[in-house]
């Protein structure tokens, strides 16, 4: 699946929003990809995650034991992608501000792929990698539906993106005047 097809699915779902948004990374952007509007449609989610699973299968040699999703944004794509890979899906969730594997056990040496929804800075993936490595897992790759950095984000393992879509993102103290003139909204899920 090509980037224009992925963005077409997001547009069909009304998930490409324009305005002034505070991203979960803290950066500001004139475009927000509201993936919840896509993930509420099982058919659209299935198409995206099937294509992502195919990319993962082509890029990751050897066995994958688990797909791990960082809660909340990675839950649905991790689950659906794992279904297409034929492996269990588990997730990490925040406890005291840090990701923890609370509801599952993972064997030392288990080969895992982290699946996230949208990557901007890669912080959630890096935090998930740290959590899983502390438990002895081998993180062989990370994957996402959309990489907003267009390949510029490094997470410490190969990052497999179904689509790369570079959208401007600015620190709050360096906003262009046209963006600064619009009231900011914070639609993300980091603090959930």
UniProtKB/Swiss-Prot annotation:
Known cofactor(s): Mg(2+)
The record lists orotate as bound by 120, 148
Q: Name one GO molecular function term.
A: orotate phosphoribosyltransferase activity
Tell me the InterPro entries matching this sequence. Answer: OPRT, Orotate_PRibTrfase_bac, PRibTrfase_dom, PRTase-like
Q: In which pathway does it act?
A: Pyrimidine metabolism; UMP biosynthesis via de novo pathway; UMP from orotate: step 1/2
The cross-references to Gene3D superfamilies, in alphabetical order and at most eight, read:
3.40.50.2020
A Gene Ontology BP annotation from the UniProt entry: 'de novo' UMP biosynthetic process
Q: Name the EC number(s).
A: 2.4.2.10
Key words of the record: Glycosyltransferase, Magnesium, Pyrimidine biosynthesis, Transferase
Cite the binding residues for 5-phospho-alpha-D-ribose 1-diphosphate.
116-124
Catalytic reactions on record: orotidine 5'-phosphate + diphosphate = orotate + 5-phospho-alpha-D-ribose 1-diphosphate
Q: Which PROSITE patterns match?
A: PUR_PYR_PR_TRANSFER (PS00103)
Which HAMAP family does the UniProt entry name for this protein? PyrE
The Swiss-Prot or TrEMBL record describes its family as follows: Belongs to the purine/pyrimidine phosphoribosyltransferase family. PyrE subfamily.
Record's function text: Catalyzes the transfer of a ribosyl phosphate group from 5-phosphoribose 1-diphosphate to orotate, leading to the formation of orotidine monophosphate (OMP).
Assembly, per entry: Homodimer.
Protein name, per record: Orotate phosphoribosyltransferase 2
Q: Which organism is it from?
A: Mesorhizobium japonicum (strain LMG 29417 / CECT 9101 / MAFF 303099)
What gene does the UniProt entry assign to this protein? pyrE2
